[in-house]
Amino acid sequence: MSKTNDWLDFDQLAEDKVRDALKPPSMYKVILVNDDYTPMEFVIDVLQKFFSYDVERATQLMLTVHYQGKAICGVFTAEVAETKVAMVNNYARENEHPLLCTLEKA
């Protein structure tokens, strides 16, 4: 008499689990979008506070946002990217600025 789980290939299930566990996570770009109202100093503050850039790099990125319309602040896993986007957008609203932070798949 056969067992009810003879049709299961436990070795294959284990291999599938290992392969899935070894897959790198999906990565997402966090992007700041230019607007005509947010002060440049505030954008620099955001880049330093939430992305740990020094003042020189934050200034370079702020100028990229200003002149090119947007800039990538970093590339992160989905959870980290979503958290950073929410934190930046909340901080901007708390300070009454329309600065927009978004994410897109890398």
Curated annotation (Swiss-Prot):
BP-aspect Gene Ontology terms: protein catabolic process; proteolysis
Pfam families named among the record's database cross-references: ClpS
The organism's place on the tree of life at top rank: Bacteria
Quaternary structure and partners: Binds to the N-terminal domain of the chaperone ClpA.
Role this protein plays: Involved in the modulation of the specificity of the ClpAP-mediated ATP-dependent protein degradation.
Family (UniProt): Belongs to the ClpS family.
Protein name from the UniProt record: ATP-dependent Clp protease adapter protein ClpS
Organism name: Escherichia fergusonii (strain ATCC 35469 / DSM 13698 / CCUG 18766 / IAM 14443 / JCM 21226 / LMG 7866 / NBRC 102419 / NCTC 12128 / CDC 0568-73)
Taxonomic lineage: Bacteria, Pseudomonadati, Pseudomonadota, Gammaproteobacteria, Enterobacterales
